[in-house]
Structure formats: structure tokens, C-alpha cells
Swiss-Prot record:
Cellular component terms (Gene Ontology): troponin complex
Positions of region (Disordered): 1-149, 255-292
Alphabetical list of PANTHER family matching this protein: TROPONIN I
Primary role: Troponin I is the inhibitory subunit of troponin, the thin filament regulatory complex which confers calcium-sensitivity to striated muscle actomyosin ATPase activity.
Alphabetized UniProt keyword annotations: Acetylation, Actin-binding, Muscle protein
Pfam families per the UniProt record, alphabetical: Troponin
Residue ranges, compositional bias (Low complexity): 46-55
Protein name as catalogued: Troponin I
Gene3D superfamilies, sorted: 1.20.5.350
Amino acid sequence: SSLEERRAARAARRRKQDENEGGEEQEETTSRRSRRRQQEDEEDSYSAPAEPAYDAEAENRRRQQQEEEEAAARAAEEEYNRQQEELRRQRQEEERQRREEEQRRQQEEEERLRLEREEQEREEEARRMAEEQKKKKKKGLGGLSPEKKKMLKKLIMQKAAEDLANEAKAKAEAKEKYINDLVPKFSTDGKDVAALQALCKDFHKRLASLEEDVYDWEAKIRKQDFEINELTLKVNDTKGKFVKPVLRKVNKTESKLDKIQRKEAKKSDFRDNLKSSREHEADKEGGEGENE
């Protein structure tokens, strides 16, 4: 209790005072200290009956304060829970609205795609019917039926593909023969270092010569392209305006053949172009000699 705490505090203070005071002062003040102790004990004994009421009132106030704090804590917790529940409901509502919006957009997109698909099908059907009407009005390829005409086109395409394959094979064989003639076979078996060095030098000379030829031919081609452009500009200046070329309708068969030829042309390398340029130059020189 508070009374015992006060007594313990006084005893501690007395012990501390006893330790601090010296020998003579201790003898002189012993009687005075004893009288003070008796007086304090009497005061404590007189004030002891009123203390339980004070302690009970303090305990009531403390308990009341604790109950108020607990009530405030419960109210704060309930408010926090209410806010969290409100936030959760708000998030659920937003999520529901978002799902509904996404579903609505998806339905609109599906409806738009369906309408576009139906429109395309109607256009395709109209185009097909128009083509059938045209086929009925005029006969194609000597009065052949559509099935026979389709078969004939298929045979023509197969023949053209075979011819292109044979032509590509012949070009590859000619290219390989030209390369083999230009670069003879050699063997390094049984050769010493000096012979290998001489062989490397020979190859280096050939490579340098070929590079020079490539550079010369490229320069000639650039010069010819420049001259062609100059002549084209002069022709356009003479006519006074640019002449629009006459456009023609391209056949599907021709476009397919051109595509096959482009694929075959991509496989060729610079040596094939070099060979064709040399042949062109030889033909040009032969023509100039005949003109002279």
C-alpha cells in the first residue's frame, strides 16, 4: 500500500542520512532524530485510517479511467473495422463495375467482329456471283470449262517450274565449271614450308587480280548507270514533261513466275554477276569491232 511505501522511503532516507553524518554529529542528533521519528510515526498512525478511503477513491478513478480508455479503444477499433469494411465494399463495387465494363466492351467487340465478318461474307458472295456471271457470259480458252481451264493452268505452272529448275541447275553447273576452271585443284601433301608459302603468294596474287577486276567492273557499271540517268533526264527535258508509263494488267501466272525467278536470283553470288559482266563486255567489244 501507499503507507508502507512512504514508510520504506522514510527508512531509506534515514539510513542514507545516518551514513552521511559523522561520529560526533551522530551522538548530538540522536535524541533529536528519535523525537522526529516518534512524531512522524504518530502522524502516520493518525493519518492511517483516512488512507483507505483515499486509496478506494483513487482505485475507482483509475478503474473508471481504464474503462473509459477501453471504451475509447473499442470505439476506435469499431471505427477502424467499419472503415475497412467500407473500403472492402468499395473495392468490391469497383471490381464489379470493372468486370461489367470489360464484359460490355468484349460483347461490343464480338458484335463488331461478327458484323464485319458478315459484311465480308456478303461481299465475297457478291464477288463470287459476279465472277460466275462473267464466266457464263464469255467462254475462256476456246470454250473450256472452269475445271479444264484450271487443270491447264496447273499444267502450265508445273512446266514453267520445271523449266526454271532446269535453268537454275544449268546455271549452277556452269558456275561450278567456271570456278573449277579458274581455280585449279591443288594439294598440300608432301610440300615443305617454302612451297606452301609460294602457293599462298600465288593465291594472294590471284585474289588481288580478281579484286582489281571487280573494282574495274563496278566502276564501269556505275559509269554506265550515270550515263543512262543523264540520257533519261535529257529525253525528259526534250519532251518537256515526264511521260507516264503505260500500265498493264499483270497476270497472276506472270506474277508467280516473277516471284520464282526472284527467289532463284537471290541464290546467285557476285561471281555469277562477274561472269555475266565479262560476257557482256566481250559481246560489246565484239560489236564495236564489227562496227569498225
